[in-house]
């Protein structure tokens, strides 16, 4: 497990997002039209379809699977309106990836950054980037939430595609840097690349988040922390990340609830409840785009908390007075000043227990 603590933030020129979006949309429409005119007569073209960049190359197995799905839907005699145009679908996916890549590069803007690690210096100027799932923890508690990191790759690093990968565009490298963290809109379903790109600032977690929570890959083993946003490979294995946004989302890094011990379940329950209360404070102190990201994160986290609470209730696991107070206040009427109130109540209860 490698560790990721703070993020490398945007520094430099900010492009005109409206102008960039219009230009990209025009280019995408032209590219899609040319592609359909060229490949539409050929029914086998979907098997040979591939992006010019190696970053977006699709496996032949995926093409064959899509052919089988199309054939199956045809034989089921569904209404014409439910037929799927494979070529149009593939064109749309291709333009989404191009749109995402261009939008992110423009959002990064002019970038000239160097990082020194002991006797080595790494340059980050070529805007090489990928996506990586992370979990966030605090004070050695259980992982609270899954977030998506935008990671930068140094100019001099050779990117080697991993062998026998179960996911497309899975890459291993020796070193990378966390640029920013984003909340997932819905962890249970794929998010379109284009939707993510259009709402890039709204999904981004504010910088204050890093001062309170540690974000690491894996299941939150605090003993393996490396105190830097710079991520280095372990002794043998390289660092895995994804060039495709949706492929990164498919990775499951938090343990399923039924695999956790009762002790860890209760610890995650309290950590998640306190996290929601902390988010309330951050929401009140953030600008509008950051508020949107934090509100999405709060809604997703509250859903996770309800799942943990119900799981423990089904197991008929009891909680003490302090635990019940924190959970009930969080789910029923959490607000920004609840943390201090809860801390005062907890201190008072502990004092009473010591006297008794």
UniProtKB/Swiss-Prot annotation:
Residues 25-72 are annotated as: Disordered. Residues 51-70 have a biased composition (Acidic residues). Residues 328-356 form a coiled coil. Keywords: Coiled coil. Residues 31-50 have a biased composition (Basic and acidic residues). Belongs to the mimivirus L17/R827 family. This is Uncharacterized protein L17. It comes from Acanthamoeba polyphaga mimivirus (APMV).
């Amino acid at each position: 497990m490698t560790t990721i603590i703070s993020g490398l933030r945007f520094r430099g020129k900010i492009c005109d997002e409206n102008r960039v979006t219009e230009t990209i949309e025009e280019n995408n429409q032209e590219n899609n039209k040319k592609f359909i005119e060229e490949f539409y007569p050929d029914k086998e073209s979907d098997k040979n379809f591939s992006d010019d960049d190696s970053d977006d190359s699709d496996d032949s197995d995926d093409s064959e699977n899509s052919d089988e799905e199309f054939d199956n839907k045809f034989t089921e005699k569904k209404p014409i309106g439910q037929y799927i145009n494979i070529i149009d679908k593939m064109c749309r996916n291709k333009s989404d990836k191009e749109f995402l890549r261009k939008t992110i590069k423009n959002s990064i803007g002019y970038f000239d950054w160097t990082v020194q690690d002991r006797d080595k210096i790494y340059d980050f100027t070529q805007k090489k980037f990928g996506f990586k799932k992370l979990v966030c923890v605090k004070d050695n508690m259980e992982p609270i939430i899954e977030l998506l990191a935008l990671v930068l790759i140094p100019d001099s690093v050779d990117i080697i595609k991993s062998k026998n990968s179960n996911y497309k565009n899975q890459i291993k490298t020796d070193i990378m840097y966390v640029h920013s963290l984003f909340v997932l809109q819905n962890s249970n379903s794929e998010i379109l690349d284009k939707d993510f790109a259009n709402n890039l600032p709204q999904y981004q977690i504010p910088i204050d988040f890093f001062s309170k929570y540690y974000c690491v890959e894996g299941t939150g083993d605090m003993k393996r922390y490396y105190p830097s946003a710079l991520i280095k490979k372990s002794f043998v294995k390289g660092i895995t990340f994804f060039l495709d946004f949706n492929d990164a989302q498919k990775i499951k890094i938090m343990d399923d609830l039924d695999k956790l011990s009762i002790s860890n379940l209760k610890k995650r329950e309290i950590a998640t409840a306190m996290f929601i209360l902390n988010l309330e404070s951050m929401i009140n102190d953030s600008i509008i785009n950051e508020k949107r990201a934090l509100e999405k994160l709060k809604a997703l986290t509250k859903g996770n908390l309800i799942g943990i609470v119900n799981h423990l209730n089904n197991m008929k696991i009891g909680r003490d007075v302090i635990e019940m107070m924190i959970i009930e206040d969080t789910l029923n009427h959490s607000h920004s000043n609840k943390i201090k109130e809860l801390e005062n109540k907890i201190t008072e209860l502990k004092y009473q227990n010591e006297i008794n």
